[in-house]
Each structure stands twice: as structure tokens, then as C-alpha cells.
Amino acid sequence: MIAANFLLNLFLYPILIKLFRRRRIGQYIRKEGPDLHGYKEGTPTMGGILFVLTGFLFGMISKTTTMVLLGMFLFFLIGFLDDFLSVVRKDSTGLKTYQKALLQTLSALIMLLLIRPETNVDFFGFTIEMGKWYYLFALLVIVGSSNAMNLTDGLDGLAGWIYVSGSIPYWFFLKERGVSEDILLILGAGVLAFLVFNSKPAKIFMGDTGSITLGGVLGTVSVLTKTEFYLVLFFLIPVIETLSVILQVGSFKIFKRRIFRMSPLHHHFELIGWSEEKIVAVFTVFNLVSSLVVLEIFGVIA
């Protein structure tokens, strides 16, 4: 099924790209973004719609946990709506920040009410009972994961390669713990096919349809498998990207000074002269090494 999903996406993406170009479903570049990105204006977007829908299909066939599929569907709707509004309005805004946050929070709450997870967490081998506070923690994990992947999706190929570099080791880690979440690999196969057309110069972008969904799935899987803290190490780059935004905003509001030339962090490296290809390569290797270190520490690989 993993290979089938890869081949299906590889076959369908050229068709989707032609269709989106014909329908002028293109990316609008935000004005506050780097000037270097001006040439990307009009590149087909919402490309995540394909690997998400095929992932959902093969996920159902592989009997993926219903809650994971539900989470995928809910976050897909948010990402799709955001991209759809951007295309219709012909600007980069889409949903407003508070609207997106509200929808993500509501989706996560629905998930938690249905999952009713145990209220303890595994803090790298130490079990901590959080009681009712766990629900707030889990809410932050799911919404935070969704936003972190969304923030990472700012360069050609970056979010896709980060997902692949983290999800495959994460799957092995869960397998070692007796949990099978094949949806991670199924989605990864679709993302790999997408990367054939998303690597610089990108012929299509995943849009929020893809990035918000990928992050939502990761957050949901971590809550279901009680691996919330481990998820951070398998996807360290999205965490760092998110922290760079928080630090940048906080520093400017409090001290009226910026820490980075621009946030998220990948834009900072762009503005100091790194090429997109170099940033994507360095970030991907960093994320992969972090993931492999986790596997080594916890005895998954000898």
C-alpha cells in the first residue's frame, strides 16, 4: 500500500498541476515575506489535497485508527478552507490567525473528547500523572504540532523533507513499542511523490491543506500513543521554527528589537545569504540526526 500510494501520487501530480494552472489556483506571496520569493507568485498551491486524500483512502484500507483518520479529516478541512479563501480573495491571507487557531482548537477538543486518553504522560521513561491538566497539555500538543508544520512550510521542499525525515524514524520507534501507525508511512509515501514536484524550483506547493494536516496527524498520533515528548525530538526543526517566531514576536513587543532578520528561522538564513537548497538540506539532516539519536538512545537501533 505504501508503494501503491507513492506511485499513484507520482502519476496524479502532473495532472493536478496542469489542472490547477488552468484554473489559476496559485499561491499569493505575503507582502511581509522575503523579496526573494516574488517569483513564486502564481505557482499552483493546495497540492497537499492529493497526498492527504490518497493517504486517507489507503489509511482506511490499512485499517488505520479511526481517531487518526478523523483528526486528519478535521485538520484537512481547516487547511483546505484557509487555502480556498486565499485563492478566492486573490491574496495571501486566507483565514485570520484567530479564526485558524479557533478551528484548530475546536478540532483538537473534539478529538480529545472522543479519544478520552489516559491522563498520564511518558516523560522519557518517567510516568507523570497530570490529571485534568493533561487535556490542556494534549490540546497544546495537537494544535502546536499543526501550527509547527505550517510554519515550517516556507521553502521549496522544506516541510515535505522534514516530515519524511521524522516520520519514518518515528514509525520505527512506535513499532518497537508495539504500536503500528502505518498512516505515518502511507502519508510519507505521498509526500515523497509530492517532493518530486515541490523541490526547487517548485511546480506546486502543499499549502495549508498539506502542512496543517500533517502536523495535526502527528499531534494526534502522539496523544494516542503517549509519545508527546518524543514527538518533539523526532520533529525538532518544526519546534525550533515555532520557538523562533515566539522569541521574535516577544522580543519585539518587549524590547522593540528583533532577534532574527526574519522569522520563522528558515527566512533568517535566507536573508543572510543561504540558498533555499542549502537551508532545506541542513535542516533535513539536522532533523534526521535528531531522530536517529532518539532511536539509538532508546535501543531501537543497535
From Swiss-Prot:
Annotated TM spans: 1-21, 42-62, 68-88, 123-143, 154-174, 178-198, 204-224, 229-249, 279-299
UniProt-annotated location(s): Cell inner membrane
Pathway assigned to this chain's UniProt record: Cell wall biogenesis; peptidoglycan biosynthesis
One GO MF term: UDP-N-acetylmuramoyl-L-alanyl-D-glutamyl-meso-2,6-diaminopimelyl-D-alanyl-D-alanine:undecaprenyl-phosphate transferase activity
Signal peptide: none
GO BP, sorted A to Z: cell division; cell wall organization; peptidoglycan biosynthetic process; regulation of cell shape
Pfam family for this entry, one: MraY_sig1
Catalytic activity: UDP-N-acetyl-alpha-D-muramoyl-L-alanyl-gamma-D-glutamyl-meso-2,6-diaminopimeloyl-D-alanyl-D-alanine + di-trans,octa-cis-undecaprenyl phosphate = di-trans,octa-cis-undecaprenyl diphospho-N-acetyl-alpha-D-muramoyl-L-alanyl-D-glutamyl-meso-2,6-diaminopimeloyl-D-alanyl-D-alanine + UMP
Keyword terms: Cell cycle, Cell division, Cell inner membrane, Cell membrane, Cell shape, Cell wall biogenesis/degradation, Magnesium, Membrane, Metal-binding, Peptidoglycan synthesis, Transferase, Transmembrane, Transmembrane helix
One GO CC annotation: plasma membrane
Major localization listed first in the record, in broad terms: membrane
Domain of life: Bacteria
Cofactor list: Mg(2+)
Membrane topology: Multi-pass membrane protein
Enzyme class: transferase
EC numbers: 2.7.8.13
Entry keyword annotation includes Protein transport: no
Protein family: Belongs to the glycosyltransferase 4 family. MraY subfamily.
Purpose of the protein: Catalyzes the initial step of the lipid cycle reactions in the biosynthesis of the cell wall peptidoglycan: transfers peptidoglycan precursor phospho-MurNAc-pentapeptide from UDP-MurNAc-pentapeptide onto the lipid carrier undecaprenyl phosphate, yielding undecaprenyl-pyrophosphoryl-MurNAc-pentapeptide, known as lipid I.
HAMAP family reported in the protein's UniProt record: MraY
PANTHER family: PHOSPHO-N-ACETYLMURAMOYL-PENTAPEPTIDE-TRANSFERASE, PHOSPHO-N-ACETYLMURAMOYL-PENTAPEPTIDE-TRANSFERASE HOMOLOG
NCBIfam families per the UniProt record, alphabetical: mraY (TIGR00445)
Name by which UniProt lists this protein: Phospho-N-acetylmuramoyl-pentapeptide-transferase
Gene symbol of the encoding locus: mraY
